[in-house]
């Protein structure tokens, strides 16, 4: 667990998100307020597996993975807001995306800052808005929905 109550290191992130390499796309949470917002980062390196084919001559992070990382940040905020503790019986699924826009490419060496805000929650469905930024420049913005579901074993 992180030293500060409003941050999350990778060990705590792993308790909340079911994703693992190569699909865990959040490295650290810098700040969050339950029910309001979360600020997370992803450090993008040339060693990312997707750069082997997207694109070898001009490596660019796929937009769908930027959205997935934003959805993972949203999932962390949802867990922190709608659950008290992570549980292997509960997941937050990416349920929808609207108004996604891409403004700039993400390249090796970039650090993406994800800012997600909770708009509303009803019956386990959360609505969020998110932005991804590199060096203060907008990379991507979207509205994201996630749904809380219990896993039946």
Curated annotation (Swiss-Prot):
Residues forming the catalytic site: 54
Q: Does Transferase show up as a keyword for this record?
A: no
| Keywords of the record | Cytoplasm, Lipid A biosynthesis, Lipid biosynthesis, Lipid metabolism, Lyase
**What chemistry does it catalyse, as a reaction equation?**
a (3R)-hydroxyacyl-[ACP] = a (2E)-enoyl-[ACP] + H2O
Query: What processes does the entry annotate via GO biological process terms?
Result: fatty acid biosynthetic process; lipid A biosynthetic process
| Keyword Protein biosynthesis recorded | no
What EC numbers are recorded for this enzyme? 4.2.1.59
Q: Name one GO cellular component term.
A: membrane
UniProt GO MF annotations: (3R)-hydroxyacyl-[acyl-carrier-protein] dehydratase activity
Q: What family classification does the UniProt entry report for this protein? A: Belongs to the thioester dehydratase family. FabZ subfamily.
Task: Please describe what this protein does.
Answer: Involved in unsaturated fatty acids biosynthesis. Catalyzes the dehydration of short chain beta-hydroxyacyl-ACPs and long chain saturated and unsaturated beta-hydroxyacyl-ACPs.
- What this protein is called in its record is 3-hydroxyacyl-[acyl-carrier-protein] dehydratase FabZ
Gene this protein is translated from: fabZ
């Amino acid at each position: 667990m992180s030293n500060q109550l409003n941050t999350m290191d990778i060990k705590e992130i792993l308790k909340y998100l079911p994703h693992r390499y190569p699909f865990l796309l959040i490295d650290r949470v810098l700040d969050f307020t339950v029910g309001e917002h979360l600020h997370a980062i992803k450090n993008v390196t040339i060693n990312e597996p997707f750069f082997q084919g997207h694109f070898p001559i001009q490596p660019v992070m796929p937009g769908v993975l930027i959205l997935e990382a934003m959805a993972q940040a949203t999932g962390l905020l949802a867990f922190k807001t709608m659950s008290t503790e992570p549980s292997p019986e509960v997941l937050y699924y990416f349920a929808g995306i609207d108004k996604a826009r891409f403004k700039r490419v993400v390249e090796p060496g970039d650090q993406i800052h994800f800012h997600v805000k909770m708009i509303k929650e009803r019956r386990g469905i959360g609505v969020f808005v998110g932005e991804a930024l590199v060096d203060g420049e907008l990379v991507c913005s979207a509205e994201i929905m996630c749904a809380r579901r219990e896993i039946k074993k």
